[in-house]
């Protein structure tokens, strides 16, 4: 904790901003502009709804800058069924790219597989007992950052809560982009290795993998610890 706070008194020359349903652009002085039925100054837009098949933009930021923290909470089921956290898909686009650098269901992005809630306590990902999902991976961008959310859920989702904490600041020339990929194999084969990641080229750091495993036969509920070979260059 002391290491984390050791430079808190230093001004880094950056502008901290936050995007929420209360301030969808993150602009200075634009938070809490909408009013609820309780009147001006009350929360009038604390969350957003999402129709089946709809895509909304959660964040649209002109750079350079760094996303430092993402917080989300969503329902885990609706009247139309469960698997809401698997049916909501996040996509991140850096610097006007056409193909997203991140494409992953919300639950799996926050280490909650199979659309089920789970408590996670780690440095980059933290999911609280009440369903608040946090990501602390820093994500730099030079020109532009865009994050979208698409619903593949069959029913209406009443609320999506989210916050993007970011900073407008210079980004070093050698800064790398954040990437995340979701992969699913419906049934593995005995004696055949499961490929976690393949076809990646360039320079970078592999920061880890979250895996959710399920046995289809009750007699095979024990999943032993496998070896994890890495093939580089």
Predicted stretch roles:
Residues 1-84, 155-220:
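Solvent-exposed, flexible loop/coil segments flanking beta-strands in beta-rich domains
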Residues 68-69, 139-152, 207-209:
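Noncatalytic modules at the cell exterior or secretory-pathway interfaces
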Residues 83, 87-94, 224:
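Short, surface-exposed beta-strand/strand-loop-strand elements in extracellular ectodomains
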Residues 88-90, 145, 160:
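Short beta-strand/loop motifs in extracellular/secreted proteins, especially
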Residues 91-99, 167-169:
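Short edge-strand/loop segments of extracellular domains
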Residues 100-106:
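Terminal beta-strand-rich extracellular "head" domains
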Residues 113-144:
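Beta-sandwich interaction modules
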Residues 221-233:
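Single conserved hydrophobic/aromatic residue that forms the stacking wall/gate
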């Amino acid at each position: 904790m002391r290491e984390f706070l050791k430079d808190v008194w230093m001004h880094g020359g950056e502008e901290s901003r936050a995007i929420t349903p209360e301030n969808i652009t993150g602009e200075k002085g634009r938070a809490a502009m909408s009013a609820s039925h309780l009147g001006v100054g009350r929360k009038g837009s604390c969350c957003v709804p999402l129709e089946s098949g709809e895509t909304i933009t959660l964040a649209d930021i002109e750079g350079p800058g760094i996303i430092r923290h993402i917080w989300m909470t969503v329902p885990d089921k609706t009247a139309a069924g469960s698997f809401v956290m698997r049916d909501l898909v996040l996509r991140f686009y850096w610097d006007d790219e056409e193909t997203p650098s991140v494409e992953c269901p919300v639950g799996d992005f926050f280490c909650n597989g199979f659309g089920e809630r789970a408590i996670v306590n780690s440095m980059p990902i933290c999911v609280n007992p009440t369903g608040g999902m946090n990501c602390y991976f820093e994500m730099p961008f030079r020109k532009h950052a865009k994050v979208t959310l698409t619903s593949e859920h069959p029913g209406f989702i009443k609320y999506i809560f989210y916050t993007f904490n970011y900073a407008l600041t210079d980004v070093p020339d050698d800064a790398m982009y954040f990437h995340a990929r979701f992969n699913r194999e419906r049934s593995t084969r005995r004696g055949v290795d499961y490929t976690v990641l393949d076809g990646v080229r360039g320079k970078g750091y592999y920061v880890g993998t979250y895996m959710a495993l399920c046995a289809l036969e009750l007699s095979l509920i024990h999943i032993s610890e496998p070896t994890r070979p890495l093939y580089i260059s």
